[in-house]
Amino acid sequence: MTQKEKDLLLRDLCARLPYKPIMQIGNCGACNLRGIDHDNSAELRDRAIVWNGQYYPSSTISFPMIDCKPYLFPLSNMTEEQLFEVQEILGKNEIEIGDGFLHIIDSCRNTITYLEILALLEWFYKNHFDINNLIPMGLAIDATGLNIY
């Protein structure tokens, strides 16, 4: 993992902390992310796990960021209901969302305020969508069909 990738993952996970993202740790099971330490290690909880041959009971455990991957949904998997929620946040009649773009169709209002942008980002983080393209980079796991959230 390059420093640039590590920084991107760290920024993404910090924004997701209030929404309890589920993480894959190495080849262990899924755990809830509790916090990120100043040394860029992830703190996990809610599950006893085995890591590097050692057993850790259910408690707070720190792991290097390189071993942690969040479970996220690609934007292309957004349902019609979710798209409607995004339209309500932006106050737009019709929008189209793809991986990496937001296209506003048929709208008489051509501006988006920074408060709408912040609300939209919060919605994406809360619903565990991959808005930073971590999945194609191998920094996150596609949660489609896993029924993990």
Task: List each language-model region with its residue ranges.
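Structural boundary micro-motifs
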Residues: 1-149
